[in-house]
Structures are given as structure tokens and as C-alpha cells.
Amino acid sequence: MSNVVVCALYKFVSLPHFESLREPLLSMMEQADIKGTLLLANEGINGTVAGSQAAIDALLAWLNNQNGLENIVYKLSFDDEMPFYRTKVKLKKEIVTMGVEGIDPLKVVGTYVKPQDWNALISDPEVILVDTRNDYEVQIGTFKNAINPVTETFREFPEYVKQNLDPAKHKKVAMFCTGGIRCEKSTAYLKEQGFEEVYHLEGGILKYLEEVKQEESLWEGECFVFDNRVAVDHDLKKGQYDQCNACRMPITEAEKLSPAYVQGVSCPHCIDKISDEQRKRFVERERQVNLAKSRNEAHIGSDVNQVIEARRQKKEALRQQSAEKNKAKQ
């Protein structure tokens, strides 16, 4: 049975003193052995974390006791292994970066559609269905007949709307994303641009996969997630994709057989994009990863120096203990 609980959460809420939440929140997470990243901004909180069921319950209870963070939106899934290496609480300008000033989902937002009502909406021929996620996410799974804006980051979405959508022509627009947060901003943006009927999937793809039976589902493929699972299937279990540690793109087992694939260094998606300097750095990082594995140590990217320092301190402690024992014998 999977014993690691993965919790994706967010809430748009005015947090004028969000900076003061960072230290107590980080302390709470570290004490509960919760790993992952939470973002705090003036507009709210967002992130995905993982830990034991008791730890996640404690985190949700802690957040519920903070002014403004009551009844936070969250979705749970499960994994056999911890999908994160670090514990972080970051202060940001936005909890999901669109880069457009004045977009406030607390003031105006699209119409929420429950997962059980989603199929009927997107089956309406008058509805334009838009996937608000990035291209690499869309490539491994999306809803039937959804439009892929082919964006590399969410910052590009407003330009896509400007070039491709027209409130006079597109009367009904439905949008979706992984957990719902990007749609909060994308629907708010469309409403600000004059679109009248704007809908979004409440709880995102993850909630849809949780509540809609596979035989009734209009979802095709797997859903990309921003942790070490890479993707989840319709049962919210780890999918078939791995991830290139160089470019972070999802890759299949077939792509790993390509000559362009070198573990931790390159894959078919990035082989022609990385510089010689990057390649050297990736080779060294992979060497350090393998070295850490051989010593049963956790390598966490750029934190390799911390691993080395921890090993040095351990050796120093053993040396001091040995010296004290020898001194006691004299």
C-alpha cells in the first residue's frame, strides 16, 4: 500500500503579511518531515508537498488556523516513494506567474464546472475547449478535442489569447489545467478581455481523474505532475513516463533507447539545445549522483556540497570519539 501522501493545494486570498508566514510554515513542515515546495504571495498560497497521512493532516489543520487560509483547496494522491527531496517555502510576486498586472481571481473569474458535469459541457459543439498548460504537459495527455496553445510557459498564454481568441466569435470558452490554479487566472484574464461565457474545470484534471470513472472519461493519456512521479494515470498512480534530468521534459522508454539519450545529460528533446558547458556540468552532476547512490546518500542536485560536508562532519565526529576513547585508555 502506498504510504506517502501527495497534497496539491492552493488558495487565492489577500495575504498582505505573507512574508511573516514563511518561517512558521517552514518550521512546521520540517518538524512534520513534509517535503515539497509551497509558494506564498500577496495573492495567496500554492504548491505541492508530500509526507505521511498524519503529517499532511497536521499541515492542513495548521493552514486552516491561519487567517485567510481556511477551507483551502487541496487534492490528495499517493505514492510508494517520497516524490520530493527538499522542503521549501518561497516568497513570490505571484503564486502562478502570468505576468499581467491587475488580474485578480478574487474579483472576477470564470464559472466553475464540477467534474461530473464537465463531459456534457465540453461535448457542446459551441464550446471552445482550451488546455492552459504548457506544450510538454499537453503532449502526454489532454481532453478529447482540446486545443493546445503550444506555450512553453504560462506567461505566453495572454499572447495566445490575443492572437487566437475573439470574444465576438468565441462565445463559449472552457479551460482546464492540472489542479485548477492556472485556470483561476486564465478565466479571470478572459473575463477582463470581454469574453462572457468562460468556464473552467473545478479542481482541475486531478480532481476529474479522481471522480470520473475511466469508462466514462473523456481524458486521453496521462497527466503531467510537477514532482518525481512525472505523470499519473487515470487511477492517479505513477504513469509510464520518466524525466530527462537535463531539460526536465517527460520521456518514454522508447525515447530512452535513442542515441540522443544519456542518463542525466541529454535526451531527444534537448540534445541539440544544450551547450558544451552545460553538457560538462550535467556529466559531472550525474557522476555525483551515482557516487551518492553508491554510498547510500541522497543527492539533491546542487546540494551535493551539503552531502560532502555532512560526510566530513560524520568522519570528524568519529575521529573525535576515537581520540576520546584512546585518551580514556591512557
From Swiss-Prot:
Matching SUPFAM superfamilies: Rhodanese/Cell cycle control phosphatase
Entries under InterPro entries matching the protein: Rhodanese-like_dom, Rhodanese-like_dom_sf, TrhO, TRHO_N
Domain Rhodanese: residue ranges: 123-217
The keyword Flavoprotein appears for this protein: no
MF (Gene Ontology): oxidoreductase activity, acting on paired donors, with incorporation or reduction of molecular oxygen
UniProt keyword list: Oxidoreductase, tRNA processing
Record field: transmembrane: none
Active site location: C177 (cysteine persulfide intermediate)
EC number(s) on file: 1.14.-.-
A single BP term in Gene Ontology: tRNA modification
Any single Pfam family the record assigns to this protein: Rhodanese
Record flagged with keyword Membrane: no
Reactions catalysed: uridine(34) in tRNA + AH2 + O2 = 5-hydroxyuridine(34) in tRNA + A + H2O
Superkingdom field: Bacteria
Recorded family membership: Belongs to the TrhO family.
Protein purpose: Catalyzes oxygen-dependent 5-hydroxyuridine (ho5U) modification at position 34 in tRNAs.
Protein name as it appears in the record: tRNA uridine(34) hydroxylase
Gene name in the database record: trhO
